[in-house]
């Protein structure tokens, strides 16, 4: 994937070169942005979706619980907030809503990236992806084949899903670097191969292959995916659940039936959107990068975006206000006063607070946005 690969190349030895002092979350990289603005004074967002920024929410030490990239977060049935990252000291960190760490585990996912949660028989289960990117012994970022794992909520492995070439779905030379999963109500697992070959691969609840779609080879370009970074099940219409897939290089979401038939595209101009997160009647997403006025993508330009029931953008916390002309969304930019580096995922709790995970963000912990 071009964007991530370029940024990895440019920052290849940062983590190896930097020593991490013992600090609390209040100085966990958050001092770099907003040096002259107190976190409690910062309100971001638009319309009915405005938030107070709490950059010191996570009560943690970089020495005890180091973070490279804070990738994704979900909330379990007990209200706990579960984060996945790619530091093998603690791939999984579990917080309570006050930001206190309850537990941490996981040492085998150097590319820990995607995290989904499902319930079966009243029990929570996690589905994780290792996207294949890892740091070698010299601190250089490299790529290898990724994997998907289904575990209990405390980390007991149930099964893993390997390279699709092992079952004849991919050709031997095709890459498999999965970035995300979505779990259907019946337990079927949809895997987004966002850093690999851009297919959406469907398995049953036991990891048996069903079918796949997407990729780059459809004669109808609208059906193709380019950096299929995220996927979610949109059940806002309970009688007609559909899949929302990220085509991040195209700055859009694409809708498909649960069987993989293309429905429509929702353009997100200037926004390199990550996984869509459906909450109530809204869709939230992290924006990893945005573009400048010349249409060029640049680093440290992320924010969060929120869409309504009609897939109209209603707020861009950390970005510029949404503007529509003739029913068409105009390009959205990062706000002049930076709040985020690279918005990679969001988790929304029952109070409608938003927890923002960031990639390549100076080792920062999740940032809490409290609805105001």
What label would you give each PLM region?
Residues 342-372:
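Blade-level signature of beta-propeller repeat domains, shared across WD40, Kelch, NHL, RCC1
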Residues 110, 129-184:
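Asp-box/WD-like beta-propeller blade repeats and closely related beta-sheet repeat scaffolds
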Residues 32-54:
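Blade/loop signatures of beta-propeller domains
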Residues 1-18:
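N-terminal secretory signal peptides and thylakoid transit peptides that target proteins
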Residues 56-64, 158-172, 176, 210-223, ...:
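Surface-exposed loop and turn segments in beta-propeller and other repeat-based domains
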Residues 63-77, 109-123, 134, 167-186, ...:
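Beta-rich, blade/repeat-based domains predominating
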Residues 90-93, 97-123, 130-132:
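Blade-loop segments of beta-propeller domains
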Residues 271-320:
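Loop/turn-rich, solvent-exposed surfaces of beta-rich toroidal or solenoidal domains
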């Amino acid at each position: 994937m071009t964007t991530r690969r370029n940024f990895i190349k440019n920052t290849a030895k940062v983590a190896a070169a930097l020593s991490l002092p013992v600090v609390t979350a209040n100085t966990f990289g958050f001092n770099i942005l907003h040096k002259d603005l107190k976190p409690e004074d910062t309100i971001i967002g638009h319309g009915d979706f405005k938030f107070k920024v709490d950059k010191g929410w996570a009560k943690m030490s970089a020495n005890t619980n180091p973070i490279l990239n804070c990738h994704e977060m979900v909330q379990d049935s007990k209200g706990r907030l579960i984060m996945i990252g790619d530091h093998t000291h603690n791939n999984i960190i579990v917080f309570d809503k006050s930001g206190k760490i309850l537990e941490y585990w996981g040492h085998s996912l150097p590319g820990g990236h995607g995290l989904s949660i499902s319930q079966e028989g009243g029990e929570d289960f996690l589905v994780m992806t290792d996207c294949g990117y890892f740091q070698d012994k010299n601190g250089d970022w490299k790529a290898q084949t990724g994997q998907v794992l289904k575990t209990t909520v405390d980390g007991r492995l149930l099964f893993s899903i390997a390279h699709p070439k092992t079952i004849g779905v991919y050709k031997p030379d095709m890459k498999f670097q999965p970035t995300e999963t979505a779990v259907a109500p019946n337990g079927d697992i949809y895997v987004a191969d966002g850093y690999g070959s851009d297919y959406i691969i469907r398995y049953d609840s036991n990891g048996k292959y069903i079918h796949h779609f997407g990729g780059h080879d459809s004669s109808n370009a609208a059906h193709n995916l380019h950096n299929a970074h995220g996927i979610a099940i949109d059940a806002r219409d309970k009688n007609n659940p559909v899949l929302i897939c990220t085509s991040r290089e195209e700055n859009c979401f694409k809708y498909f039936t649960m069987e993989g038939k293309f429905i429509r595209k929702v353009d997100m101009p200037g926004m390199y959107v990550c996984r869509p997160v459906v909450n109530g009647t809204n869709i939230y997403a992290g924006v990893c990068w945005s573009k400048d006025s010349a249409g060029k993508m640049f680093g440290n330009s992320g924010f969060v975006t929120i869409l309504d029931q009609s897939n109209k953008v209603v707020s861009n916390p950390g970005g510029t206000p949404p503007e529509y002309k003739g029913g068409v969304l105009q390009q959205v930019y990062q706000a002049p006063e930076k709040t985020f580096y690279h918005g990679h995922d969001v988790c929304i709790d029952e109070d409608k607070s938003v927890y923002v995970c960031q990639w390549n963000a100076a080792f920062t912990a999740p940032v809490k946005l409290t609805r105001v």
